[in-house]
């Protein structure tokens, strides 16, 4: 038979675990992590779309990406799937789930057991400028903790990549 103080400690521990699980689930639903970046390039909408849609060329500006494999090869579309080889050795796979030419495309991938949604949005500001918005959202158990960790790490790569992408896209307008 267990001593009363042992039973009390076990019950308190179990209650603590239940409260922690409820807190994580509540955070997951109420405050899911979202990473969003908006920037403007000096290209018409169509040219900005075409430039970014060449995902196999992303390593030229996204230095954390070594290689992008697109299936089927060629143009990005609703049936496209892909895999990236990252400089840290990871090989995340993704599939396009939404494709609205010159407006947005969204692909879905994974990180551990989380599902990550990457939205690439385009908005014409005027005939020579386009606003591009990247939105990264995560869903899954523990997203309030793991999603924030993913966002913290990924945001640094994203900020460096966007700066290089803007330079590359703006330089392409004179060619």
Regions found by a protein language model. Name each.
Residues 135:
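Alpha/beta-hydrolase-fold catalytic nucleophile elbow
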Residues 4-13, 40, 59-60, 69-117, ...:
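Glycine-rich portal/gate segments that line the openings of hydrophobic small-molecule binding cavities
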Residues 2-74:
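Hydrophobic ligand-binding cavity/cleft-lining segments
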Residues 138-160:
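A short acidic/glycine-rich loop-to-helix N-cap element
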